[in-house]
Amino acid sequence: NKAGWRFILTIRENYKEQVKSLLEEQDLTDFEYIDIPLLNDKELEDILEKNQRKIPVQPHLYKDLHNLFYLAKYLECTTSTNISLTQFRDQIWNIKVRGMGIEDLANQEKREQCFLRMVQTQLEKGNYIIPKENLDYNSVSELIKEGIVAVDGFYGYYIAHDLYTDLALVKLIDRIWHKTQNVKDFFEGLPDDIRHQNAFCKWFSVLLETDSLNLADEFIEQMFEGLSYERYTNAIVASVLSSSNCGKHFFEEYSCELKNNNYKWLSKVLRILMISCQRLHSYVTY
């Protein structure tokens, strides 16, 4: 800017256009993108080989390891290649957030609840900085040591990496599901924001690959009946169409629903598919 300051914003690919619009609204047009792509297959496999690790069996886990954050945690927290994505996320959570192996069970619970409270406070208030009030000091101190939480002077704390926030949201969504075990009640318990939508996509994609089609059908049928928030309709469709287990089943089982009302639902599905393909095209740069 005019004072000589240079600002670096780290953003996700799917937020790029939103941030661009916000900057342009403030007449801040002198900016450039520095794209940091995910690892390609060869780069990932070379790193695994150098660390004497084999390629993981589970496709969803292999996909996540193209992200350097998850790859580092994979090398740090796991030893087996025969591990699912859910098990991998649980290991990161248990070791880094809960402090499994160094904390007793009571302190593990305190650390977990403290971090979940921080995530919920940040999302509810919409502020980057989380106030220090009502947080367990010892738990926060341990989270700082792990590099999960950082200190912002005298004002409070912030979460050092948003992928830890994602893990927390998936954990919270899973708890809502186990608490309700009813698809309609489950969706009524989900907040209407993009962070929860993204976390739901991750949670639901794993569910589609690991559970029976009967459970997937419950979610799809509820979608056709109607959901409180449109964003979760989009999330269900995108997850189902990208699922190796459920994509073909969806079109065969629900062909009538897709054709009803002058192909209303089919048009919606195709629109969501088109948007997803556009995002994928801009996302895969290697």
Predicted features, each with a name:
Residues C77-S141, D152-Y158, D162, R175:
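Winged-helix-like regulatory helical subdomains adjacent to P-loop NTPase cores
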Residues N14-Q58, Y70, Y74, W93-V97:
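Conserved small helical "lid"/interfacial subdomain of P-loop NTPases
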Residues N67-L71, H161:
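Short, conserved phosphate/pyrophosphate- and ester-handling motifs at nucleotide-, phospho-/glycolipid
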Residues E124-N127, D174-Y286:
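Extended amphipathic alpha-helical scaffold segments
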Residues L163-W177:
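Short active-site loop/helix that positions an aromatic residue
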Residues N1:
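Conserved nucleotide-sensing/catalytic segment adjacent to the nucleotide-binding pocket
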Residues G4-E13:
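Structural recognition of the conserved hydrophobic beta-strand(s) that form the central parallel beta-sheet
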